[in-house]
Amino acid sequence: MSWSILELIRNNPEVLKENLKRRFIDTSTVDKAVELDKKWRQTLQEVERLRHEHNLISSQIPKAPKEQKSELINKAKELLKTLEDKEKELQKIEEERENLLLSLPNLVHDSVPIGPDESYSVPIRFWGKFKVYKDDVNEFLKQTNGHKVDYEVINWKPVGHADMLENVLRLGDTKKAGEVAASRFYYLFNDIVWLDLALLLYAIDTITSRGYTLVLPPYMLRGEVIKSVIDLDTFKDAIYKIEGEDLYLIATAEHSIAALYYKEEIPKEELPLKLVGVSPAFRKEAGAANKDLKGIFRVHQFHKVEQFIFSSPEDSWKYHEEMIENAEEIFRGLGLPYRVINIASGDLGAPAAKKYDLEVWMPAQAKFREMVSCSNCLDWQAYRMRIRYVEKNNKKGYLHTLNSTAIASTRAITAILENFQKEDGVVEVPKVLRKYLETFSGAPKEYIYPKKKPNTTS
């Protein structure tokens, strides 16, 4: 969204209606916004007329004959009361109009495939050699959408990541975590914890080497702030709120980093500002009640490294490609085979004008699973957060914001468990992670071996 959306409401509302149609959203909001804006402009004219009339009469009072002063004073008081009431009405209409405008999603980029759900998303490239169980070859080829890919057929069925974690390696315990916390929480032990830490360090190392500033952000934000970063009405069931306080736990470092320049102006010559944040991520996952019930793929709490860029409007599409390339470099380094997909319009979140997902092939599940989301939000977030750039001639405008996952540790672990396992249950540690583990005596060096489950009872 941008301030230009108000211009479209006034001059070309059909563009906004078409955008909502492309997102498969009801268009009545645009009609309501048009009517409210018309009412706002009419009320503004009335306020200006009353203000002018009040000022005119007030200016006549000192010069008026004594017998007319009392009448003019009373008339000025009546006008002032009418003006104050009309100004309150104007403010109320403006707030209603602003809330409607803020409810509108971003304008979909022309390169986004049009469709109501994820099934209309389009794979645009594949990387790596895919390990495919012999009975899953046809299903795999269907998911390549006709792209030429390199794959290896294996005769043994890989074990799913949940069973690998808890029953083969015995390095996780979701049952006990569910007992003492809730479902979708977990205990991890020893080698898997080291793997989690190594993944974070590897992602941070990769992104900071490209000139991004490392950030450790707040893990909570005030309601006013977080609703300017995301569509809180839509995602209120996904975000944890602290009871009795106006604070929300972040679902990603994107939220806190986006707010770093809340209500500030940035000299345009300082753009782009490239940052990479590391933080825990907290998610209710209320909309995923029956999805991924086992293991650590979809959980309430995990560690995440997030890329973020504040960009000038003319450069944001260039940086969108840069950020997905950074993410791809991380997964190429890990040796995890993946595809990049262009997300369909109906599956875009409200802030994004375009989004790429990077999905890794999971051989035990015979499907691709999301590891990375990379979005260009244009000025949708910046307008809400009042973050503007300032040119040397003092011309101002809303900058663009972009975000992308670098690594979500638990999801990356599930991908490693399925892609790097051997038939005997041993899991190879990706070579690129080993340098982050070699100095620690207790960390795995090359392989993670099946072990007995740690004793968690006293």
From Swiss-Prot:
The gene is serS. This is Serine--tRNA ligase. Transmembrane segments: none annotated. HAMAP family: Ser_tRNA_synth_type1. It comes from the Archaea. Its EC number is 6.1.1.11. PROSITE patterns: AA_TRNA_LIGASE_II. ATP binds at R283, K284, E285, V299, E370, M371, V372, S373. Pathway: Aminoacyl-tRNA biosynthesis; selenocysteinyl-tRNA(Sec) biosynthesis; L-seryl-tRNA(Sec) from L-serine and tRNA(Sec): step 1/1. It is found in: Cytoplasm. Homodimer. The tRNA molecule binds across the dimer. InterPro entries: aa-tRNA-synt_IIb, aa-tRNA-synth_II, aa-tRNA-synth_II/BPL/LPL, Ser-tRNA-ligase_type_1, Ser-tRNA-synth_1_N, SerRS_1_N_sf, SerRS_core, tRNA-bd_arm. Consists of two distinct domains, a catalytic core and a N-terminal extension that is involved in tRNA binding. SUPFAM superfamilies: Class II aaRS and biotin synthetases (SSF55681), tRNA-binding arm (SSF46589). One of its GO terms (biological process) is selenocysteine biosynthetic process. Belongs to the class-II aminoacyl-tRNA synthetase family. Type-1 seryl-tRNA synthetase subfamily. It catalyses: tRNA(Ser) + L-serine + ATP = L-seryl-tRNA(Ser) + AMP + diphosphate + H(+); tRNA(Sec) + L-serine + ATP = L-seryl-tRNA(Sec) + AMP + diphosphate + H(+). Pfam families: Seryl_tRNA_N, tRNA-synt_2b.
